[in-house]
Curated annotation (Swiss-Prot):
InterPro entries: aa-tRNA-synth_II/BPL/LPL, HisRS-like_core, HisRS/HisZ. This is ATP phosphoribosyltransferase regulatory subunit. The gene is hisZ. Coiled coil: none annotated. Disulfide bonds: none annotated. It comes from the Bacteria.
Length: 383
């Protein structure tokens, strides 16, 4: 069973327009384009446990390969090979299709392909590379003409908060507690054999999310002063100012954990609430350990990036008006064909979309029908 994308022409046009608009923003921030291979080494993906092996789509002719489930791993690997001598920091952007499969009913799988666009910032010698990456995300989305009813929220967390929450349970129901917190499973948490006071704290944190300053204060009251909370306080102080300029809300969710096992540190999602229908537009986070894995000798071991779902974004844009001039060239006599070819080229050099009808046409009513069939805005007769 497969989820094959058969886009109509409008979808294809909108996809291309969105990707081009995003690429133009990335370039203004100094990012260079890269195109990772569609084929990944299976052991590279499995070795880093980036994604569940059951979600990978293998290659029948070579069991050691798979279609790429995401692009970050391939790009980070390049920094230790072809890009090893490139000056740091490395700023890259990409766009393309990723592939995965999801378990469906009766032990069958549903194949999926998703078009995405994103950036990677690797080995940036600064404490908070998140500031640049999230700023670019806001700028990129701001350059896309979204529908007015799309209210944006950046949901942020860090794997370090979950580490802080689970610190006292390393030898006592660690995995069970983590699963309950990530899945917001109040019922299973209630059944665990742990101290009642601890259980009450975990229950309170289970549905804790909101304005970062308020959530950080709550965490500080529970866990006291520590580096994790202080660093988040500094980061959100800057991000909150940036988000206000773009009219994007920021929420801190201590229990949010990403699906891909790429990230260690800050993780985030950009969510659109369109009339109470929530859509994830973008995902991202830090992957310092992935950088270390591929290049342990890297002097500045950090990496962060995001991916934007073009498929989801396309459903939320205001479609651009297609009133661009498009000329249909017609002639009444066959001997005018050569002149028509020259005229078509002359108009195209001026940037005018031009279609030359290769058969003679002597009927004005037929000419109007041809103009509509070719979606042209006007007719020019070759004389």
């Amino acid at each position: 069973m497969s989820d094959i994308k058969e886009f109509n022409l409008i979808d294809v046009r909108n996809n291309s327009s969105i990707v081009n608009d995003l690429n133009n923003v990335y370039k203004l921030w100094g990012y260079e384009e890269i195109s990772p291979s569609f084929i990944n080494n299976l052991e590279t993906i499995k070795g880093r446990e980036v994604i569940d092996g059951d979600e990978l789509i293998g290659i029948v002719s070579n069991s050691s390969l798979c279609l790429r489930p995401e692009m970050t791993t391939s790009i980070v690997k390049l920094t230790s090979t072809r890009l090893l001598n490139k000056k740091r920091p490395i700023r890259l952007f990409n766009s393309g299709i990723v592939f995965n499969k999801k378990q469906s009913y009766k032990n069958t799988y549903k194949f999926q392909e998703n078009l995405q666009s994103g950036i990677e910032l690797i080995s940036y010698d600064t404490q908070y590379p998140e500031i640049e990456v999230i700023n670019i995300l806001f700028d990129a989305i701001d350059n896309i003409n979204l529908i007015d009813s799309c209210n944006l929220t950046l949901l942020v967390s860090t794997t370090k908060i979950m580490d802080l929450i689970l610190f006292n349970y390393k030898n006592n129901n660690y995995e069970e507690i983590k699963k309950c917190m990530v899945n917001l499973d109040h019922e299973s948490l209630d059944k665990l054999n742990i101290d009642n006071n601890d259980k009450a704290i975990l229950k309170e944190l289970l549905f804790t999310r909101g304005e970062p300053a308020i959530i950080l204060k709550k965490l500080k009251n529970i866990y006291g002063n520590n580096n994790v909370i202080e660093e988040l306080d500094c980061l959100f102080n800057t991000l909150s100012k940036i988000s206000k300029k773009y009219n994007i809300k920021i929420q801190l969710d201590p229990t949010y954990q990403p699906h891909l096992n790429l990230y260690a540190g800050i993780v985030f999602q950009l969510i659109c609430d369109n009339k109470n229908v929530k859509t994830i537009i973008a995902k991202g986070g830090r992957y310092d350990e992935l950088v270390r894995y591929f290049n342990p000798n890297e002097k500045i071991i950090n990496g962060i990036g995001f991916t934007i779902s073009i498929d989801n974004l396309r459903e939320l844009i205001v479609e651009k008006s297609q009133t661009k001039k498009k000329v249909l060239l017609l002639f009444k006599n066959s001997y005018l064909l050569d002149k028509g070819i020259n005229e078509q080229k002359a108009l195209q050099k001026k940037g005018i979309i031009t279609i030359l009808y290769l058969n003679p046409c002597n009927d004005n009513s037929k000419a109007n029908i041809l103009m509509k069939e070719h979606n042209c805005t006007e007719i020019q007769w070759i004389k």
